[in-house]
Every structure is written in structure tokens, then in C-alpha cells.
Amino acid sequence: MTKILLYNNYNYYVAGIIMEIENLTKDIRTRAFERKEPKTPEQVGASWYNDDLTYDGVAKTLFIILPTPGCAWALGDSGGCTMCSYVSDCTLEPIDTQTILRIFHEHLSRHPIAEEDKISVKLFASGSFLNPYELPKDARDEILHTLMNLGNVTEIIVESRPEYVKEEYLDEIFEIIGDTLFEVSIGLETSNDYTRLKKINKGFTREDFENAVKLMQNLKKTKGYNLKSKAYIFVKPILVSEKQAIDEAIETARYCNSIDVDRLSFCPATIHTGTVIERFWRKGAYQPPWIWSCIEIINTVRDELDMPALLDTSGFGSRRGPYNCKKCNKDLKHMIIANNLTQTKIEYECECKKEWLAEINNANMNASTVEIKHIPLY
């Protein structure tokens, strides 16, 4: 039985068990796969169309989830990231190009787009758009050709791990899309290498992230590519207190600004089935962040930094997501969504804020090493 030593109020003694995180992630992932049937490509594909913040302001944005086998990092020996379950929403086996394209075209046809509308398109692959083993090159190229033929796509947004951000792949893409804006979003999660590698099990370093960003910046300068970078920042990994989560997210935003990342997107933790974070949560060793913590982060960043910063509201107000109280959960979620478009601070008061402040202000006081509980993770 693997055990973790837990200090009072989420202050953890991690020596001796941090090395087990990767093994635990792999074990939980394997068990999750055994309990459920892989999805069909048709079940994986999805799309929606609404207003979103683009580099030219608020505009119509088409979101398309492409059917893929799943993230190569999660399907490999690493077991993937401790908070992510996207691979559970994939086929877990290769998909032929024709099937991918058929489903892409089906979803594209569901959203009639007026010729006068200038739109942004976000392509999600539940992994890395730039990894040819997840999304075959011929499928990728045909998708991009199709979008260019629409005549009114001004931005294309994709996601990728940094190791797939290669000059060869970007050359191939810009040969098709010309001067269209192309943003690569990378899940940096945190600027703290120890947190990213040992608590999130991300599998790449800050240097790897910097190299990907620098490559894109260099290609923009030398080849004129209309390239942008975005960093996803994860709010409150396991083995991190509420106060530490706030400080680390803000510090990560400052770091991204210092290396000229173009945009930020904060992703507060939600509890997904078949993940390490769910195991901690079920054992009483983890709780998603307060919504107040998320607001503190986004307000500070919008005050300090001159760069677009978004705050994801997935799971807000639910048992498995960021939560304040029943009085303010819904109001704050709606305010955050609206303020993502205006990039303004969120001003709101509720009685539950006192409880949040007490937890934050007493963070150091609660870091006692006297009473140690043993929490079995298996």
C-alpha cells in the first residue's frame, strides 16, 4: 500500500512519495481504461459557435473537437498529467484520415457562417494538433485548406506540447495558411519546474517551453509568420495549498510576460474521473480552488500585466469544481465569462469571502508538522 504523509490543511510532506506520482498516474489511468469502453470517432467529435475574445477584439469563434486516439503523453508509460482525463474522451486507437475529415466536415456544416463574418477557429485534438501521430499530416493539411477556402477565417488556434513545435511543421502549415494568424497554445501550467514535473507529471521543463516560444518568435521575425503563443496556467495542482496556488499562478503569469508570451489562459482545477487528482479528492486530501482565489489571480494579472488573460469557468459551482457558496457561484461565473471579453477586473462581494480570506491569511499558521495523517492512495 502506497501512503502519503499529509500535514494539516493541505500542507504535504512529499519526500518519499513524489517519485510514486508517475506510477500512480499510470495505474489509475490503466484502471480507468479497463472500466470504460473507448469512444467512437463520432462520439469524440464536437463543435459549437459563439463570441470569444480574439486578437482583433470580440468576434465569432468556431470551436471544433477533432477525433483523435488521444494525447501521446497520456497513452505512454508516463500515464499523463495528474489532473487530465481528456484521453478518456478519445478512441485510444488510430483513426484513418478519411474518418477524421468526414467528422470535421460534418461539424463544419452545422454552423452556417455568413460571408461577411470574420471568424476565429479553435481546433482541439485532446492532445497535440502538431503531433502527426495524433493527427495525421494529410488530415491536418486538408483541414487547413478547407478553412482557408472559406475565405473569412482570420485566426486559427491549436494546442500542442512544446516538443511538437517544430520549424518543419510550422513551415508546412504556413505554406497553406499564408498570413493568417496561427496561435499555438501550450500547457505550461506553472513556471515552477518542480511542481510541473513532480506534482503535475507534465514531462517537460520550463526550458522546453521557452525553446518552443523562442522558435515561434524567431520564425515570426525571420520568415514573417503570423505566429502567436498562449500559455495555459493550471490553478491549484495537488500538494499545493490555496495560498501557494494563488501565488504560483500569478508568478507564472509574470514569467510568461517576461518572455513575451502573447496570451494567457488560466485553468482552475476540476475533478475528472480516472485521475490522480480525483484519488486525492476522494481521500479528503484535495479540494478544488475557491472561486475567490481564481478572481484574485485574474484581477492581479489584469492589474499588473498588459497582455490578454482569460479565466476558464468549466465546473464552476459544481461539487467537483471551483466553488464559493450557493449565493454567489452562478453570479460570479457569469461575470467571469463577460469580463473575459472586456478584459476588466471582477468586482463582487459576498459573505463567504470572509471564510476564504481566513484560509488564505492563516496559510502559514496552519503549516504545522505536529499532527501527521496517513492517507492511503491505493
Describe the role of every protein-language-model region.
Residues 44, 53-102:
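Canonical Radical SAM [4Fe-4S] cluster-binding loop centered on the CxxxCxxC motif
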Residues 207-275, 294-313:
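Conserved C-terminal portion of the radical SAM core fold
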Residues 111-113, 147-148, 172-181, 217-220, ...:
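Acidic (Asp/Glu)-rich catalytic clusters
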Residues 94-109, 135-146, 204-212, 245-253, ...:
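Well-ordered, non-membrane alpha-helical segments in soluble/globular domains
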Residues 92, 96, 163-168, 238-243, ...:
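Acidic-and-aromatic substrate-binding clefts and catalytic sites of carbohydrate-active enzymes
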Residues 85-107, 111-136, 150-166, 180-209, ...:
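Core AdoMet radical
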Residues 133-141, 166-175, 243:
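Distinct, well-ordered alpha-helical segments
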Residues 5, 10-11, 18-34, 43, ...:
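Auxiliary Fe-S-binding modules of radical SAM enzymes
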